[in-house]
UniProtKB/Swiss-Prot annotation:
Its main location: nucleus. Component of the Mediator complex. It comes from Xenopus laevis (African clawed frog). Component of the Mediator complex, a coactivator involved in the regulated transcription of nearly all RNA polymerase II-dependent genes. Mediator functions as a bridge to convey information from gene-specific regulatory proteins to the basal RNA polymerase II transcription machinery. Mediator is recruited to promoters by direct interactions with regulatory proteins and serves as a scaffold for the assembly of a functional preinitiation complex with RNA polymerase II and the general transcription factors. It is found in: Nucleus. It comes from the Eukaryota. This is Mediator of RNA polymerase II transcription subunit 16. The lineage of its organism: Eukaryota, Metazoa, Chordata, Craniata, Vertebrata.
Length: 697
């Protein structure tokens, strides 16, 4: 584990240099980081609570939102798509922020809810029923469906037809649970209910979900002598109103409080976290005093309830069916640690079967198996999520500026700089921390936790995680932190091999993702950087092709035949004539009729296609030079076939509106440039054998 980079903001006056409020941060699946700060005016009377959005790939470009929260922001939560963000404050107000036009630097407040005057201590989006499991045991198989299996999991609430209903759930300090549901028409249904009849103060809380569609809420009043309470929450819609039902579940006392030797040593519970949002059976607890902490991991299990002999004698049949009860059992506990300041849990849904854990241990594949603890002395430690045994450590001294004199640090009466907020990336290969000075640090977490591995094993680990991001659509920037320049070529080749082993339908779905993934990988090495522009050009070509084909409409509605775009592809592949007009007469030209203003608005895209075809044909004599942009296109039959289809489509549109055609400078006024380019392009396309016609090279 080491430092990737540190972001330092503009210096503030000493009185407001250190943030006066607890910092909150959240990491989305798009590798966008949201975090909060408070901003004082010159008189230091009014405080503005800001939300900052930062792209980890461009940390120098931070977008700040004036949240409008009058009180301190206590919670931030991204949705599963990474395009919406929830913020909640100490006044009970919850706001939902959404991207404007899919831009990471443009956000607006969409909807919201409030529990007036009741601070929010826990917040979560409702579960959408989508859950994957990564099987390390099957990392060597070819099928993505076996590597990343779909786990049966019910949404928290469903609409007609089983579609998951969107919304969020929050827990307040006074023991209330509030649920807001987003209806398809934009209406918000909100309901509030007490977790139990006897309401009590809630200092810490967390939310998790069960496979049956229920919600589990864990609460604690902050005292280690008090029990940690658990509640089952069921949400439903009755007569267009949101209804909440709660039920008390078994509670637990931390083991450190039941040990006579340590009964009063750790008076406060400082952290309460479920190990995963969709794993309500395991919880992490941390108790602390002024100087030290202790962490415990608990698991909820079904156990048989022993019956008294009297009941067994009265009814022998009863003894055959032993009643089962739910009971919390401690899995592991740490020794006395430095005082914990922040906890980060893994988001990677790795399978925790005995076989998968054994294979992960043998191959030194640890993403998803470790959780991070930040301490008040500035250190950060990764511990195993089940055994709580140390796996890696980063000392706080490596985070301090090297130019700062050590004597100055020793004499400083101020507390040591440490992280107040900590979050893991979605592949568990990076950490983000916000310290007491407001600095943001990105830390690299090695997949092997520092163990030395041979090159093939390291490539297999990174390939497995890249495949996971390809299947889920998550951003893979944090994986690139661990890719060395010498790995790029082999990684790209192996990624392409695994992609081509999938069925045709899945390849079509993943075609653009693997292009984007290869482009980002090739940027990391000087030997492959020239291929980056080819991948971006292919992405742009696919986008233009999909856009233009989507404008076509069948002449007769409700026809069971193929769509016009599919027929265009079929005809162009079937007729290999070099004469564009002979290919065009086999199409139903009435399907290509568009409005004149629409055709004219496409002229810029049409011009790009024409220029690109011209560039490829001009560079054909230099095809032996692999460093020239466009080199891979000359051997890519599928991309050349797509260009042929676009040329035929443009030819038809040119008959309707000649001004939309691409403009060329010809040597003769009578020369048909479109026909000439199509003839040369077709000859080049025919040189690509059918078994080499693929979209990705």
């Amino acid at each position: 584990m080491d430092v990737a980079y540190i972001c330092e903001w503009d210096r503030r006056p000493r009185t407001s240099h250190c943030p006066s409020i607890p910092l909150v941060c959240a990491w989305s699946c798009r590798n966008l980081i949201a975090f909060t700060t408070d901003q004082r005016n010159e008189e230091e009377k009014d405080i503005t609570n800001l939300i900052h959005i930062l792209d980890t790939e461009h940390p120098w470009d931070v977008y700040s939102i004036n949240s409008g929260h009058q009180e301190v922001i206590t919670c931030l939560e991204w949705d599963q798509s990474g395009s919406r963000l929830l913020s909640a404050d100490a006044d009970g107000r919850i706001k939902c922020w959404g991207m404007t036009d899919h831009l990471a630097n443009s956000w607006q407040n969409l909807v919201g809810s409030e529990v007036d005057g009741d601070p929010i201590v826990a917040l979560s989006w409702l579960h959408n029923g989508v859950k994957l499991a990564l099987h390390v045991e099957k990392s060597g198989v070819s099928s993505f469906g076996e590597k990343f299996s779909r786990v049966k999991f019910s949404p928290s609430l469903t609409l007609f037809g089983g579609k998951p209903m969107e919304g969020w759930i929050a827990v307040t300090v006074s023991g209330l649970v509030t649920v807001s549901l987003l209806k398809p028409n934009g209406q918000v249904l909100t309901a509030t209910e007490s977790l139990c009849r006897l309401r009590c103060r809630v200092a810490l809380a967390d939310i998790a979900f069960t496979g049956g569609g229920n919600i589990v809420v864990a609460t604690c009043d902050g005292s280690s002598t008090s029990p940690v309470q658990f509640y089952k929450v069921c949400v439903s819609v009755v007569s267009e109103k949101c209804k909440i039902d709660t039920e008390i579940l078994p509670s637990l006392f931390m083991r450190c409080t039941t040990d006579p030797a340590r009964k009063d040593k750790f008076p406060a519970v400082t952290h309460l976290k479920f190990l995963a949002r969709d794993m309500s059976e395991q919880v992490l607890l941390c108790a602390s005093n002024q100087c030290s902490s202790i962490a415990e991991c608990w698991s909820l299990r079904k156990e048989g309830l022993p019956l008294n002999n009297i009941f067994q004698q009265l009814s022998p049949a009863v003894s055959d069916k032993q009643p089962m009860i739910l009971k919390w059992r401690i899995l592991s506990a740490t020794n006395e640690l430095e005082r914990v300041s922040a906890v980060a849990l893994p988001k990677l849904p790795i399978s925790l079967t005995n076989t998968d854990i054994k294979v992960a241990s043998e191959t030194k594949f640890y993403p998803g198996l470790g959780l991070a603890l930040a301490f008040h002395d500035g250190n950060v430690q990764i511990v195993h999520r089940l055994s709580l045994q140390p796996m890696a450590v980063l000392y706080g001294s490596s985070l301090r500026p090297s130019e700062e004199p050590s004597l100055k640090r020793q004499r400083s009466p101020t507390p040591c700089i440490h992280f107040k907020a900590l979050q893991m990336s979605w592949t568990s290969l990076a950490l983000v921390g916000l310290d007491t000075q407001g600095k943001l640090s990105i830390l690299r977490v090695s997949p092997s936790m520092g163990h030395s591995l041979d090159m093939s094993t390291s490539l297999r680990h990174l390939l497995f995680l890249l495949e996971y991001c390809m299947v889920t659509g998550y951003d893979w920037w944090d994986i690139l932190l661990h890719v060395q320049p010498g790995m790029v070529h082999n990684l790209v080749e192996k990624l392409n091999e695994e992609y081509t082993r999938q069925n045709a339908a899945l390849q079509q779905v993943l075609s653009t993702r693997i292009l984007a993934m290869k482009a980002s990988l090739c940027k990391l090495s000087q030997t492959t950087v020239t291929r980056v522009c080819d991948y971006h050009a292919k992405l742009f070509l696919i986008s233009i092709s999909c856009t233009l084909k989507s404008l076509l409409r069948p002449h007769v509605l409700n026809t069971p035949d193929k769509s016009p775009g599919d027929r265009l592809t079929e005809i162009c592949n079937k007729f290999t004539d070099t004469d564009i007009d002979k290919v065009m007469i086999n199409l139903k030209t009435e399907e290509f009729v568009l409005d004149m203003p629409t055709l004219q608005s496409l002229q810029q895209l049409i011009q790009w296609l024409g220029d690109f075809v011209l560039y490829l044909l001009v560079s054909l004599p230099n095809q032996g030079s692999s460093v020239r942009p466009g080199h891979s296109f000359l051997r890519d039959g599928a991309s050349l076939g797509t260009l042929r289809e676009m040329m035929v489509m443009i030819r038809i549109w040119g008959l309707l509106k000649p001004s939309c055609l691409p403009v060329y400078t010809a040597t003769s006024d009578t020369q048909d440039s479109m026909s000439l380019l199509f003839r040369l392009l077709t000859r080049l396309w025919l040189c690509c054998p059918p078994h080499n016609q693929r979209l990705i090279t």
